[in-house]
Curated annotation (Swiss-Prot):
Catalysed reaction equations from the record: (2R)-3-phosphoglycerate + ATP = (2R)-3-phospho-glyceroyl phosphate + ADP
Species the sequence originates in: Leishmania major
The encoding gene: PGKC
Residues noted as binding (2R)-3-phosphoglycerate in the record, renumbered to the chain: 23-26, 39, 61-62, 64-65, 132, 168-169, 216
Enzyme class: transferase
Protein name: Phosphoglycerate kinase, glycosomal
Length: 479
């Protein structure tokens, strides 16, 4: 999934240009204060690149899931269409200003910001209000998305996407604007995200372990099915583990279980065996009779959960086993917590996995990738995020990428001019499943693909023939 086939911001001319940057500033806000600015900080390199090169930035983002007004709705007497205080980006504007060390203008209506954009000078920054205040942003109708995109595109000259977190959305700001402008470039964050996922999906250092957790097997079916053909080890935790354990005939007490997915769990375990993937499930558990915090939760001595109890975290023996598995690997990708880590009494398993990955990365060169969402939050809370190779900003996007799906927000970006032998490697941008034929340079051929191997063979044969003829001629001359 290397960006060699998509143009990056380094390929764009931004001097004296107004650069529309789609960022993902969907950050947690409480009482008007941002509680985690990781996504904002992650976008800074792209913003700073434009400012340094003599361009101006027009930042576009969403926050939350506001209801959204229609473009055709009349403007209210006070305020702007679609406005919801809980989803305003004003606090984000203040935080970006602090991080950049300069004033950031704020346009209170993203579709009535032409006057703000026209006043921009080189090295200025403008943040538009939440693009989801308009329903057209995520409309299922292409013509509605395009109508909004045309307005936004009129503000700028160049489009850059740095919003991997929404790359799985076909929206006005992700796919509509680059379509209107006729070009789209990847920002540094987008580039980093795709390059890391490319390595882990196409040609990772081995052994490779996938650590999968969360509540439901049904949420991870496609991920598991797609990854089983790529990994060496599968570590399962979280509530979804108990569907697998019941499928194996284990007692799970009153732990969460998807009864209608038991056959699916059996099928996935069988498929793992057929593909020589070693699966690890919890061997002990931290339990309680209710779904709430406890001063002294029960820690089981066996793999079975007692009647009347629900498992809410993995136990100490399981932690040790999972740490050992991670320790023997060269690559690890993590998607989903091991327990209810939001409650301190059930956080040890999740934090132990985070620590094992962080330590492995720093001391043993482990390539560690956190697949966004709850896993990213857990890595931050544990203090291990800084030690990982990569913590993704995209929960849903990373999940769909791991499932082998197309990411519209990546596919729309402009192709880079490359030689014919690289042009067919579409999976590099999440637009198909990898195959040795379609992606020879990244799918296992040590010489870079069958076509290249054939060319090398031709050259070697020609050299051998030349040597043979040369020797025959030399022999004749000597005689």
């Amino acid at each position: 999934m290397s960006l060699v086939l998509k143009k990056s911001i380094d390929d764009a001319t931004v001097r004296d240009k107004k650069v529309l940057i789609r960022v993902d500033f969907n950050v947690p806000v409480k009482n008007g204060k941002i509680t985690n600015d990781f996504r904002i900080r992650s976008a800074l390199p792209t913003i700073q690149k434009v400012l340094k090169e003599g361009g101006s930035c027009i930042l576009m983002s969403h926050l939350g899931r506001p209801k959204g007004a229609r473009m055709s709705d009349p403007s209210p007497e006070k305020g702007v269409r679609g406005y919801e205080e809980a989803a305003t980006l004003r606090p984000v504007a203040a935080r970006i200003s602090e991080l950049l060390g300069q004033k950031v203008e704020f346009a209170p209506d993203c579709l009535d910001a032409a006057s703000y954009a026209s006043k921009l000078k080189n090295a200025d920054v403008l943040l538009l209000e939440n693009v989801r205040f308009y329903a057209e942003e995520g409309s299922k109708k292409e013509e509605e998305r395009d109508a909004m995109a045309k307005v936004l595109a009129s503000y700028g000259d160049v489009y850059v996407s740095d919003a991997f977190g929404t790359a799985h959305r076909d929206s006005a700001t992700m796919t509509g604007i680059p379509k209107v402008l006729g070009a789209g470039y990847a920002g540094y964050l987008m580039e980093k995200e795709i390059n890391y996922f490319s390595r882990v999906l196409n040609n990772p250092p081995r052994p490779l372990v996938a650590i999968v957790g969360g509540a439901k097997v049904s949420d991870k079916i496609q991920l598991l099915d797609n990854m089983l053909g790529r990994i060496n080890y599968l570590v399962i935790g979280g509530a979804m583990a108990y569907t697998f354990q019941k499928a194996q005939g284990r007692k799970i007490g009153i732990s969460m279980c998807e009864e209608d997915k038991l056959d699916l769990a059996k099928s996935l375990l069988k498929k793992a065996q057929e593909r020589n993937v070693q699966v690890f499930l919890p061997v002990d558990h931290v339990c309680n009779k209710e779904f709430k915090a406890a001063d002294s939760p029960l820690v089981t001595e066996s793999v079975d959960v007692p009647d009347g109890y629900m498992a809410l975290d993995i136990g100490p023996r399981t932690i040790h086993m999972y740490e050992e598995v991670i320790g023997r690997c060269k690559s690890a990708i993590w998607n989903g917590p091991m327990g209810v880590f939001e409650m301190p009494c059930y956080s040890k398993g999740t934090f132990a996995v985070a620590k094992a990955m962080g330590t492995g990365t720093q001391k043993n060169g482990l390539m560690s990738i956190i697949g966004g969402g709850d896993s990213a939050s857990a890595a931050e809370l544990s203090g291990e995020a800084k030690n990982m190779s990569h913590v993704s900003t995209g929960g849903g996007a990373s999940l769909e990428l791991l499932e082998g799906k197309t990411l519209p927000g990546v596919a729309i970006l402009t192709d880079k001019d490359v030689k014919e032998r690289g042009a067919s490697c579409k999976f590099a941008f999440g637009v198909g499943s990898p195959s040795r034929e379609a992606c020879p340079l990244r799918c296992g051929h040590i010489f870079g693909g069958a076509s290249i191997v054939r060319e090398i063979v031709k050259i070697v044969v020609a050299l051998l023939i030349g040597i043979f003829i040369g020797r025959r001629m030399s022999t004749k001359l000597i005689r």
